[in-house]
Amino acid sequence: MVKDFYHQHVVEALIKDGWKITHDPFYVPIGNRRGYIDLGAEKSIIGAEKESNDGLQQIAVEIKSFISKSDLNDFEGALGKFQLYFFALEDLEPDRILFLAIPLGFYNRFFNDTFFTKLIRRANLKILVFDEQDKTVNLWIK
């Protein structure tokens, strides 16, 4: 399995943000086939507004680099992959939240278009925006 260009950047950003990487990659059965979400991670939650039943928040992260010549083609592929993994994960681990990790540079140039900001809401897309230079998490869009 080939890792995305920014794979290690996202791993480091999540660790800096207090997450423990539990799966690299995270295997997900898709029908009779195998799918691999880039990462699985968990974080102990402290504080009332983030508390869950067992005090643990679990996520899966699909990383996309968006470094080809066409942002739109990259996004179409990422959205399709996100939806496929979302439905597979819903059956396997319904409490684990799936995020699409995207670089800050791509986020700034692509999501200034209201069409795509509406699409995030309509498609229930969860996004983790990471700074590809600092290797930090900049924004969680839930």
What are the language-model segments listed below?
Residues I63-F75:
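Short beta-strand-loop-alpha-helix junction that forms the active-site gateway
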